[in-house]
């Protein structure tokens, strides 16, 4: 989810970010590369499974064919082959190398990252991981931004609440269900929260996944709403009593900032990039059942500390804009051209 938002937001702002008064204008061409069988729209088609397993030499040749002779080429995911010059690549995280239930990494990706003219990492944490595990030298750290829709988000309308079944007071977990999301701990923590806050529900949104279903289906006070229409997501966040992010490992943690932008307090694990993104504007907890339960119970108490957390969160989210991120990307693009 975060990687897709990143691609759309940076691509939308690339031309404006590269515009410098008095200098020749840049032309931005966007290649939306899809597999041959993908039903999604795209202006380039490749046999992606074969490209992913191709030799390093073959991938370089494919890159020459795919990108042409631009001054800089920004690969926004590691599946795409490298450019022959001006090669920029983004690392959102290195989970493919660390977690067996994630998609396996492209065989040549680590070497291609080391050979790239520039590597952009979305957090200091990811940059340190890329250096330590992949041997990437001098990565550029450029934080993600927050979609403006979350700053202006109104709570869900009554008909949308009824359609989703979410009610008035709920804790929201939004995103994937891979092992690093730590849903087992959230499932272990929830009964203690439910006993203490019986009027509160746990709402879990995200694409269907057997782990999420196994852990939460039929659990008292828990509700699986599946993949929510994108137009409803800001309202779903804004209507929440709090957002919980118990992950063991995140390359950035965009749901933290989206909640803060929508004036919703956050409980997040004190792991990976989450403290870097949240700053002092979230309740940071150990990623254990006891830690998560205590954090959720605390954030749902009616006291001035929670109100202060909401104000601090809003201010924190305002520091992360896609305009700033795009300008910093443009500096990297110019540096390799």
Predicted regions and their residues:
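Carbohydrate transferase catalytic cores enriched for Leloir-type hexosyltransferases
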Residues: 1-337
């Amino acid at each position: 989810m975060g990687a897709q938002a990143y691609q759309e937001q940076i691509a939308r702002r690339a031309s404006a970010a590269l515009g410098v008064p008095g200098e020749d204008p840049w032309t931005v061409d966007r290649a939306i590369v899809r597999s041959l069988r993908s039903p999604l729209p795209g202006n380039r088609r490749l046999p992606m499974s074969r490209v992913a397993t191709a030799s390093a030499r073959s991938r370089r040749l494919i890159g020459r064919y795919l990108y042409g002779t631009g001054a800089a080429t920004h690969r926004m995911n590691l599946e795409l082959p490298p450019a022959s010059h001006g090669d920029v690549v983004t690392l959102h995280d290195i989970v493919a190398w660390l977690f067996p239930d994630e998609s396996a990494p492209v065989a040549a990706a680590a070497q291609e990252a080391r050979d790239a003219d520039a590597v952009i990492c979305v957090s200091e944490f990811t940059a340190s991981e890329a250096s330590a595990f992949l041997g990437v030298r001098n990565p550029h750290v450029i934080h993600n931004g927050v979609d403006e829709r979350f700053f202006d988000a109104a709570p869900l309308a009554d008909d949308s609440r009824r359609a989703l079944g979410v009610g008035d007071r709920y804790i929201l977990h939004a995103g994937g269900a891979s092992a690093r999301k730590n849903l087992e701990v959230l499932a272990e923590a929830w009964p203690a929260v439910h006993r203490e806050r019986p009027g509160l529900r746990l709402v879990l949104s995200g694409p269907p996944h057997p782990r999420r279903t196994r852990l939460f289906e039929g659990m008292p006070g828990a509700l699986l709403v599946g993949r929510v229409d994108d137009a409803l997501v800001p309202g779903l966040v804004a209507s929440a009593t709090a957002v919980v992010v118990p992950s063991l490992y995140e390359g950035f943690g965009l749901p933290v900032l989206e909640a803060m932008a929508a004036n919703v307090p956050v409980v997040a694990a004190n792991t990976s990039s989450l403290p870097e993104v949240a700053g002092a504007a979230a309740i940071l907890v150990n990623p254990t059942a006891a830690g998560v339960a205590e954090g959720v119970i605390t954030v749902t108490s009616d006291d001035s500390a929670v109100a202060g957390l909401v104000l601090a969160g809003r201010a924190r989210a305002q520091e992360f804009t896609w305009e700033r991120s795009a300008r910093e990307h443009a500096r990297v693009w110019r540096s390799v051209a």
